[in-house]
Regions:
Chain B
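Intrinsic disorder/low-complexity segments
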Residues: 1-10
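Non-transmembrane, aqueous-exposed alpha-helical and coiled segments at domain scale
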Residues: 9-415
Length: 141, 415
């Protein structure tokens, strides 16, 4: 088994550095609908239902739900130290920027290749938002 | 050159003035610095070229911990609002604690600190969700930053000022810095209508506009609807309800009613001569469907909660008119939320006296989504606002017209 690194440029929105296992969601995420103590997605019928977003590098299309619940949702996860380590999103709007800003989690978008094609759940990912670089450690048999 | 150096260091494209750079460098204190940092991040997300001045802001303060964190970050960092910045309701702390002993201490503490934070920031302490009626009124064409579900579309569409769909924090940051990134609805092309909504339903009262907003928001989700076919000019309260509901069931930051709202007098102008992305029609059947979806139950009720969004003076007059000569049934708690300014006039005009005489309460500074309603956690109530029912602070909240709410309060049950 060998590992290979894929290094991609990205667009920084909220700076900082975060690394962890990737968790890919093709559906929008509402942080309020996760368990604030564990980070487990509680939203029924969500593709991540039952999975924890704690300490992950979360790859997702966008946020959703009203600004108040979305921001408070991520804030509570951070208070319990179960927030994601970094956010890689596709459509970033004001509420998501505010959410990441107040919990100081790096937020990036516009990877030079489609994040949903390049990154697989479980791969180790480093997000260096300051440098505008995402590094994916690919495991190959 | 400082500007290009800064751009290089940040690796970004947004142009910042010398003054803005000095704010970012912390020369004007940490509070203002953090506020601008947030605005720059938002600008970068939208590829904004630069910042533009805003003349006023409305922060949808909420008494939640995420809100508290940001307010204290700015207030403790010495920031002050640079332009008039009004605040959303939290709750009337001394009033509610006198009535209910069981409001959780930690929640009350958060509310107290949020309110104190805005006070220290020099905000307009309106504690109202309809500040555009009295405390903080934009004019046509003004550039502002207004958060709050009814405020954003009302300001854009009814008044014709320009605001993006702000979060409480981004609006507060804009109020503190006096600027916002140039993106979204601040740009004319982005104010183009997206969906044509042909209305043939009969709209006879404020509640019908609530249903219309609910249906349109749900159908369109995100977009700028252009509504045609509305023959009678809607009044202020009807427009408030339409705004509040369409921006809760969907994300409608702006709409047009050509000929009735100010920005476009014709349908073509609203679409900026482009074709609609989609078209929907709203007949009586769709409104009935919306109503049926919201109907939750009938039977015994413990409380009635009105004033989401905050009731206007006219609505307080209506409540007083319906309650005159009647008594609210024992065991039913009857509440109307309004702004401090509307209450003063309602008191002067005798409406508060009538409502209180019938056994009701008229409360200011308070939102229905606050811990002060803790006592109703396991209770069933009734409201004329689907938004109120949606917050789920209660076991159940049935939705109906104001007349039905008052009737249920008098009888102790919804028929």
């Amino acid at each position: 088994m060998s590992s290979r690194e894929v290094v991609l440029k990205c667009h920084k929105i909220i700076g900082g550095y975060g690394e962890g296992e990737a968790l890919v969601s093709h559906e929008p995420i509402c942080f309020y609908l996760t368990d604030p103590k564990t980070g487990i997605v509680r939203e029924k019928d969500h593709e991540l239902a039952g999975k924890s977003i704690a300490d992950k590098v979360l790859v997702f299309p966008s946020g959703k739900a009203s600004s108040v619940v979305q921001i408070d949702g991520l804030f509570k996860l951070a208070q319990h130290k179960v927030a994601p380590k970094a956010l890689i999103a596709k459509d970033v709007e004001t509420v998501l920027v505010v959410s990441a800003f107040i919990v100081k989690i790096p937020l990036v978008d516009r990877l030079e290749k489609d994040a949903f094609e390049v990154i697989r759940t479980g791969e180790f990912v480093e997000v260096d938002a300051e440098k505008g670089i995402v590094t994916i450690k690919k495991q190959e048999a | 050159m400082t500007v290009s150096l800064c751009v290089k260091l940040r690796g970004l494209n947004m142009y910042l003035t010398k003054d803005e750079e000095r704010i970012l460098a912390g020369e004007f204190g940490e509070g203002t610095q953090k506020a601008l940092e947030l605005l720059v991040a938002i600008g970068d997300a939208y590829d904004a070229e630069r910042m533009i001045p805003v003349s006023r802001a409305h922060a949808a303060s909420s008494g939640q911990e995420g809100d508290l964190y940001f307010v204290e970050l700015l207030a403790n960092g010495g920031a002050k609002c640079k332009v008039p910045t009004s605040t959303n309701p939290v709750y009337d702390i001394p009033y509610f604690h006198k009535i209910f002993a069981n409001i959780p201490e930690n929640e009350a503490d958060v509310a107290k600190r949020v309110m104190d934070g805005y006070r220290r920031l020099g905000a307009i302490l309106s504690w109202s969700c309809v500040p555009y009626l009295a405390e903080n009124i934009p004019l046509f064409g003004e550039t502002v930053a207004f958060s709050e579900s009814s405020a954003t579309p009302y300001v854009n569409s009814v008044i014709g000022a320009r605001t993006n769909r702000e979060a409480a924090q981004s609006a507060l940051a804009a109020g503190v810095v006096g600027k916002t990134p140039l993106y979204g609805l601040h740009i004319k092309e982005n104010r183009k209508g997206t969906h044509l909504v042909k209305v043939s339903a009969t709209l006879k009262d404020e509640f019908d506009y609530t249903l219309l907003g609910y249906y349109v928001g749900k159908q369109i989700g995100y977009g700028i609807p252009v509504l045609t076919g509305i023959s009678a000019r809607p009044n202020t309260e009807e427009l408030i309800n339409f705004c509040a509901m369409s921006n809760v069931s969907g994300a409608i930051s702006m709409f047009y009613m050509p000929g009735l709202t100010v920005e476009a007098s014709t349908v073509e102008e609203a679409f900026q001569d482009d074709v609609p992305k989609d078209e929907i029609s709203v007949t009586d059947r769709e409104l009935k469907k919306a109503y049926d979806e919201l109907q939750t139950a009938s039977g015994k009720i413990d409380f009635v909660l009105l004033g989401c969004p905050h009731y206007t003076l006219k609505q307080l007059e209506e409540v007083a008119g319906l309650l005159k000569g009647k008594k609210i049934r024992e065991g039913v708690s009857f509440w109307v939320c309004t702004s401090a300014t509307a209450r003063i006039l309602a008191e002067r005009n005798g409406y508060v006296g009538i409502i209180e005489g019938a056994g009701g309460r008229v409360v200011v500074d308070t939102c229905i989504d606050e811990p002060c309603w803790f006592a109703f956690k396991d209770k069933v109530g009734m409201t004329d606002s689907p938004k109120c029912a949606y917050y789920r602070r209660f076991k159940d909240a049935m939705v109906g017209r104001l007349e039905d709410c008052v009737d249920a309060a008098v009888k102790g049950r919804r028929e």
